[in-house]
């Protein structure tokens, strides 16, 4: 119960802090001629997911960083003795692998989605060098595997609900692998608008940056204050 409360407070406060910046991104998108409320709702849910992952993995606030390396570089050494933990690490990143290609059309190649999941997991593991937690290659492998499973889930849902891409997706799909969803191919004025919009090109990176910056600075202070109120 305390674990669920901790995740709820961490992810919820991270989302609340991120909402103003995410709404600003939507406003900038509307200025360029794209109005996508479902996409904005999806980005907010993705921000909640990022904040939840940061909370669960115990990334420390910047003002609490203290180098205390505990590193495991031997892959799958405890696969059978600690299988449930391997499974949890994989499941943690399944929603991540689903939402990235759903929300951003230019990330709809499996290589891009899995690479993003790998880099995010690598960031987490490197930060855990400063959090008195273990930096484990198994976590990196299972998180990346979970991202791939999430991508497969996205492709499966796409077969059942082909219109979901256009409803939640934004930006332009270059179609480098020949994979286009319904409505992915812009033309005429719409293509020109998208090509000129830096928000379309950088929205995912901005979302990551905003959420991670807030989770490493302001959010821990707010979470501490909320816990103090609960236990008064």
Regions of interest found by a model, annotated:
Residues 131-134, 145:
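A ubiquitous, low-specificity "background" feature that marks scattered single residues
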Residues 135-141:
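Loop-to-transmembrane alpha-helix initiation sites
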């Amino acid at each position: 119960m305390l674990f669920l409360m901790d995740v709820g407070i961490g992810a919820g406060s991270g989302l609340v802090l991120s909402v103003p910046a995410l709404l600003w991104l939507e406003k900038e998108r509307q200025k360029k001629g794209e109005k996508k409320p479902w996409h904005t709702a999806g980005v907010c849910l993705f921000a909640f997911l990022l904040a939840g992952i940061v909370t669960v993995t115990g990334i420390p606030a910047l003002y609490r960083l203290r180098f205390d390396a505990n590193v495991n570089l031997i892959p799958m050494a405890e696969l059978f003795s600690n299988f449930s933990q391997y499974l949890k690490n994989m499941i943690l990143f399944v929603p991540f692998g689903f939402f990235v290609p759903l929300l951003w059309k230019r990330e709809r190649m499996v290589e891009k989605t899995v690479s993003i999941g790998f880099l995010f997991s690598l960031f987490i593991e490197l930060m855990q060098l400063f959090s008195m937690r273990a930096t484990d290659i198994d976590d990196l492998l299972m998180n990346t595997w979970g991202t791939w499973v999430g991508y497969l889930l996205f492709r499966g849902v796409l077969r059942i609900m082909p219109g979901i891409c256009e409803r939640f997706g934004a930006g332009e799909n270059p179609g480098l692998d020949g994979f286009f969803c319904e409505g992915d191919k812009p033309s005429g004025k719409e293509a020109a608008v998208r090509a000129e919009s830096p928000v379309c090109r950088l929205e995912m990176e901005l979302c990551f940056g905003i959420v991670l910056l807030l989770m490493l600075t302001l959010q821990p202070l707010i979470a501490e204050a909320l816990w103090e109120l609960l236990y008064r």
